[in-house]
UniProtKB/Swiss-Prot annotation:
Domain annotation B5: ranges: 306-383
Signal peptide positions (record): none
Reaction catalyzed: tRNA(Phe) + L-phenylalanine + ATP = L-phenylalanyl-tRNA(Phe) + AMP + diphosphate + H(+)
Chief place of localization: cytoplasm
GO aspect biological process, one term: phenylalanyl-tRNA aminoacylation
SUPFAM superfamilies: Class II aaRS and biotin synthetases, PheT/TilS domain, Putative DNA-binding domain
Gene Ontology MF terms: ATP binding; magnesium ion binding; phenylalanine-tRNA ligase activity; RNA binding
Protein name according to UniProt: Phenylalanine--tRNA ligase beta subunit
Statement: the UniProt record of this protein carries the keyword ATP-binding: yes
Domain of life (superkingdom): Eukaryota
Binding site for Mg(2+): D361, D367, E370, D371
Keywords assigned: Aminoacyl-tRNA synthetase, ATP-binding, Cytoplasm, Ligase, Magnesium, Metal-binding, Nucleotide-binding, Protein biosynthesis
Pfam families documented for this protein: B3_4 (PF03483), B5 (PF03484), PhetRS_B1 (PF18262), tRNA_synthFbeta (PF17759)
Length: 617
């Protein structure tokens, strides 16, 4: 959860609390009731001491409250938002009514070039006119940008914010994408002019906090850049603004531009910045729009767009879900306390809520129910014993896994736990298999080692053998864990715990894998382990192979194994696994120096464990 650092004295002043009489415990209770948490009480001096190890007496010793807020409550990421919400909650302020005014003149336009589509296609903008900053509000303005960048903006990769002194610029503005060498300007907090290529090199070689953002656009042949009508660079998103339009305490008119890969997130960020600080404008809670024009010369709209959406919530649903019994009019009153204007439907069976632009977290009636519960007070909710009796128990598949893990350990095998993610080769080519598209791939893999979800336990067992070359032979290891297989979408048969249809496009299988490594391949060791497993599960040997009851073995042509040594395991007429001596090419792929034999079984309740679980129950 994001933490917001706020000066206690400034916060208390904004809330109308008298510092000498309002205690920390009272504030903690207020936070809990509202749904946030006072996580830590510290000071700037103490925070710097913890960071550097040296106490600096020149740093302020004012009390700082660190407040935990929900990750989706972007309106609570600054002093202004928290104070505004708590004042309405405490009946000390009315719900603010945000207003927009059209562009002051034809210069408040932003033109988009076609080239930006390949690098950062979305831009929106707005203006705070006649704003008055104090040192505290200025610091909060900067801090909110950093909080948004770290949260919804995903460290600027998804969205980035640029703020500028409008009086130093001349509209209209132009959003372009140019070659790095063609972008020249003096970046923020610098005195020398750089082109973008030189600037990236400068930041890459320095200890600047901006270094971590360079990879976002570094490999692009063109970089996004915003100019004014006099060809002055406003910003190089998502990296740095220009020094020319730097925001100062004396700034009166603020131009805010937000570039992004996602228009919805861009609008949320722009609206948050504007609504939080519009209270300092000459006309409080008023924002000026900017017209954005696309590459074809067509207007994409005026921003910000602050139309309130409406959500209907059934009165019975709210009462039942929250465990309360209050009237519809009481719900309207409680929602007003949570800064939500609402009214009753004509039949008074539902509540129509006007969701303000600051509450992007409200998307469903359940969110309305949650705010009613907060307004009602969690401490006021009555504890009730459920009118149904349930008995908890272990999931059958987990019970089966635990039973087999104990038995295999008693047979002298060591249990291992390995990574669920792997490379593509571990699912296919390293095991002498062709890629059949059955693996679930990670869309934004952090490492080349972890790009897919494993489809088998064989590869991780072989990796474990390879990693334990220094251990004395024989090596006897096993693992019981899940693998994931890509499956077609469809309606899952809930009565069948092993149904391969999943509403997420993939399904898990519980697998058992065991490996034996020694100077010679002794398949009888693994075969003996299989026989022990079948004995424990009360599955008889079907010597005739005709009854579909019991288990038997048949020759396998799986290229994982040395020809003539691969064996399929058939239980109740279904193939549930295989075992054999691992092929030398596969051993080479995993740098295994000695022969290995492997057993891999799919564990299912209906096929593998029906007898033993029925007996135990």
């Amino acid at each position: 959860m994001p933490k917001v650092n706020i000066n206690r004295d400034i916060l208390y002043k904004a809330l109308g609390f008298y510092i000498k009489t309002y205690t920390q415990e009272q504030f903690e209770d207020l936070c809990f009731a509202f749904g946030v948490e006072l996580d830590e009480v510290t000071s700037e001096r103490e925070m710097k001491k913890n960071e550097t190890g040296v106490e600096d007496l020149t740093v302020s010793d004012d009390v700082i409250y660190k407040i935990d807020v929900s990750a989706n409550r972007y309106d609570l990421l600054c002093l202004e938002g928290i104070a505004r919400a708590l004042n309405v909650y405490n009946h000390k302020a009315s719900i603010p009514k945000y207003q927009i005014v059209p562009p002051k003149n034809s210069h408040e336009k932003l033109y988009i070039s076609k080239e930006v589509e390949s690098v950062r296609p979305v831009i929106v903008a707005g203006i705070l006119r006649d704003i008055t900053f104090t040192q505290e509000s200025y610091d909060s303005f900067i801090d909110l940008q950093e909080k948004l960048h770290a949260n919804i903006c995903k460290k600027r990769s998804l969205v980035s914010i640029g703020t500028h002194d409008l009086d130093t610029l001349s509209g209209p503005f132009y959003y372009k994408a140019l070659a790095p060498k063609d972008i020249k300007f003096v970046p923020l907090s610098q005195t020398k002019e750089y082109n973008a290529e030189e600037l990236f090199k400068f930041y890459d070689e320095s200890s600047s906090h901006l270094k971590k953002f360079l990879p976002i656009i570094k490999d692009s042949p063109v970089y996004p850049v915003i100019y004014d009508s006099k060809n002055v660079v406003c910003s190089l998103p998502p990296i740095i603004n220009g020094e020319h339009s730097k925001i100062k305490l004396s700034t009166k008119n603020v131009f805010i531009e937000v570039t992004a890969n996602d228009r919805t997130k861009a609008n949320i960020v722009l609206n948050t910045m504007l609504t939080m600080f519009s209270e300092y404008c000459k006309q409080p809670f008023t924002m000026e729009q900017v017209e954005v024009i696309d590459a074809d010369g067509k207007s994409t709209g005026l921003y910000p767009q602050i139309q309130e959406k409406q959500i209907n919530a059934q009165v019975d649903y709210i009462n039942k879900s929250a465990g309360i019994n209050i009237t519809p009019n009481d719900m309207v009153t409680l929602l007003k306390r949570m800064s939500l204007q609402s009214k009753l439907s004509d039949d008074e069976k539902s509540i129509i809520v006007d969701v303000p632009v600051t509450r992007s977290d409200i998307m469903h009636a359940c969110d309305i129910m949650e705010d009613v519960a907060i307004g009602y007070g969690y401490d006021n909710l009555k504890k009730e014993i459920p009118n149904c009796n349930t008995i908890g128990r272990v999931q059958p598949i987990n019970k089966l896994s635990e039973l087999l893990a104990n038995e295999i350990a008693l047979a002298g095998f060591t249990e291992i736990m390995t990574f669920v993610l792997c490379q593509n080769r571990d699912n296919f080519t390293a095991l002498n298999k062709a890629d059949d598209g059955s693996s679930v791939k990670i869309s934004n893999a952090v490492s080349e080692e972890f790009t897919e979800v494993r489809t088998n336990l064989v590869s991780t067992l072989l990796k474990s053998v390879s990693a334990n070359k220094a251990a004395p032979l024989p090596l006897k290891m096993f693992e019981i864990s899940d693998v994931s297989i890509k499956g077609s979408l469809g309606n899952k048969d809930l009565s069948d715990p092993n149904s391969n249809n999943s509403d997420v496009g993939a399904y898990n299988k519980r697998m058992l894998g065991a490996i034996y490594c020694n100077q010679s391949a002794k398949i009888e060791v693994i075969h003996g382990l299989l026989d022990r497993i079948m004995l424990v599960l009360d599955i008889k040997l079907d010597a005739t192979r005709s009854s579909n009851k019991g288990y038997y073995l048949e020759l396998s042509n799986d290229k994982l194994f040395l020809p003539g040594t691969g064996i399929n395991v058939i239980v109740n007429g279904k193939r549930v696994g295989h075992m054999g001596i691992v092929h030398p090419l596969v051993l080479k792929n995993y740098s295994c120096s000695f022969p290995c034999t492997i057993l891999e079984l799919e564990l299912t309740i209906d096929t593998m464990a029906h007898n033993v679980l029925l007996r135990e129950n």
